[in-house]
Every structure is written in structure tokens, then in C-alpha cells.
Amino acid sequence: MPTLSDKTILILSPQSWGTMFLSKHHYALELARMGNKVYFLNPPDYGPARSNNGPASPAIRIGPSGIHGNLMLISHRLWFPYLLKFHAMPLFHAGMRLQMKRILKKIGRPIDIVWSFDLGNLCPLTWFGPPIYKIFHPVDEPSGPQAIAAAKGADIIFSVTREILEKYKAYPAPKHFINHGISPEFLPTGGFPVDSPHAVRGEPFRVGMAGNLLRSDLDRPTLIDIVETNPAVIFECWGSYTGGQSNIGGGGDKETHAFIAALQALPNVILHGAVPAAELAKGFSRMDAFLICYDIKKDQSGGTNYHKIMEYLSTGKVIISNNVTTYKDMPVLMQMTAERDNNDRLPALFRQVIENLSTYNDPARQRERIEFACGNAYSRQVERIAQLIKDRK
């Protein structure tokens, strides 16, 4: 029976390690803090590395994360074309299987748990036989057959939405909802907050937004409309807005450049870029409210759940958002539009909440939001996962 301490854990991630943290990065760090030896496998570098003599050669590098002694980062360059993934998946898997054998040899110690967040199915779980315990943990909306096939061989499946779990109903592995977590940097250390300090001092309200601004699934017209029609509100944005800042991808097309330029031109917008978690938490603590504005029809999460929600809730301040199914019956936690196909009413909802901010941020509501967030700390989520694994034995 696996426990989630004193183990060697290999995490398969579709996003590289970097400044911006998603669920897989937070779980890796929390598992390391709990006494596990964690190896975080970055997705492969594109294109084969070649020596001076010409033939392709694999490059596998394992090094310290720099933030915890138990957390190691694995970078690797393929010895075969990555494009095989899109044209000849069996050949790609043949090459990746040999690559994985070399990675495991480089690690040099037995793996107890493989924890996969990999919707691309780059490294199928069926490659890892007993006694390795295999966890499949999709936190993004699966699209395409490989995303579904990635669950094959899992001993247990966790996800942040019930909609995602439903898509894996064909697999016999037990399936459980585990909400997004929150890292220690965002957990309150003092007393519960009071009313907005900006309201007390007669200063402009500040509304926070976090996430990759390069994403094409943002509802850009609605967001620009909200900012332009609320000139007395300061909008502070954290997250990548240039390609070099992002470790989690994003568009570089002319529409994206035009959107970023429009934000930069607005006098009530501040773009902070990607920052470490501690700095992000400090910035959030200054906010009076938070805004989420995705186009559900394009949204990679399908408007079901977002990691940032838990971090916003940790401040106690109100969230104004497009429709999010996970929180549809929790009006104290979030103020959202009812529609699933458009955000036409989001600007009006934003104005209503801002005009009545003292009501939406009364102490009782703030306390409920903070307590909900604290109950979903990553340490608590790992405890829940460990118990669910134990209960299956």
C-alpha cells in the first residue's frame, strides 16, 4: 500500500518547470516537503540534439530545483523527431519508451509512484509495471483520443472537475474529485481581513487578475469593455504577457499582440508579468476584488474550474466571473454569470458588485471564503489523496 511520504515519485508534466506554477508544480513541491524524493519530468525539448560527428544523441539532465532539496528537475532532448507524435504515434512511443528507460536509469533508484498529469500521452502509464503505483491526474480538459488513452493503466484517477472524470468512465480505475489546491504562500497567517483599506482611504478600488494573458481563450472584448467602462477602478494583472515570460505556453499571433497592446495603453491597467508565488500572494492581499473573464466556448477548462479561484478565495475578497460549474451552487464564494454560452451580462455584474463592494466583502463572507481556501491547501489535498488510496486497499 503506497503512502505519500518517504517515497520516490516521478511526475509527468505537460508543462515545464518555471516561474508560473500550475497544479502539477504545486503538487511536486508539496510532495517534496512531505519527505518524498520527487523527480519532475519536463516535456521534451523539441528537435534532436546532434554531436559534432552528426548522429543524434539524447541529452538527459537531472538537477536540483533550487527551491527544495527533495525536488529534482529532469530536462531531456529527444534523439528522434518530435513530429512523429503527430504523424506516427506508434513510432513516437517506441522512441519515447527507450527515452524513458534511459531517464529511469539516469535517476538511479527505484520509482515507487508515477504521478501523471500528461494529457498528451507522451509516456503511457502501461509502461510502468508493478510494484509502481500509477496515479492519473488530469487537471485540464481532455481533448482528443490521446488525452483519453493517457488514463490506461492507472491504478486511480483524480481530477478537479466531475466533468473531466466522466470522460474516463470507460476505465475501471476508481475516480475521485479533488479540488484545486492552494500553496502555503497564499494561506493567511494573521487575523481575518476587514473592509477594503482603499474604501476607508477613499482610494480607487483595485481588482486583480492572474494567469497567462497570452491565452486565446480569454474573452478579450469583454475584458477590454469592463476595463474601459470602469476608469475609476485599477486593474492589476499578474502573468505572462510576452512570450519570453511564459513556461506554460500562449499565443504569439497578431491578435494576441493587439490585445496586449490595448491593455498596455489603458491608464487603469498595471501589468506585473510573471512573478514568484510569494510576491503574487503579497500582491493579491492588496486587492478589493478579482475578475475572471474567459470565453467558455474557447476555454481549455470549459468553464468548469480554475486553479486561480482558490488563491483568490484565500484573500477573502469577492470574485466576479464568467460561469464556473464547480462553484455554481456557492454564491458566497463567487459572483458569476448564469449563461454558459456568453459573457454578455458580465460587465453589468461587475459594476453591480463594485458599487456594492462593502456588502460582498462583509466580514462573514470573507471568513467563509478564507476557510474554504484553507480547507483545500495542497497539504490537505495530498492527505485526501493518500486516504483515498489507502481506502482502496
Model-derived regions, located:
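Nucleotide-sugar-dependent
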Residues: 18-22, 278-283, 290-313, 320-331
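A short alpha->beta transition loop at the rim of the catalytic pocket in nucleotide-sugar-dependent
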Residues: 35, 288, 316-317
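Acidic anion/phosphate-binding donor-loop and adjacent secondary structure
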Residues: 145-148, 182-203
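A charged, aromatic-enriched C-terminal amphipathic alpha-helix characteristic of glycosyltransferases
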Residues: 194, 341, 358-391
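Conserved donor-binding/catalytic core segment of Leloir-type glycosyltransferases
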Residues: 199-218, 223-228, 235-238, 374
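Nucleotide-activated donor-binding/catalytic signature segment of Leloir-type glycosyltransferases, i.e.
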Residues: 239, 248-281
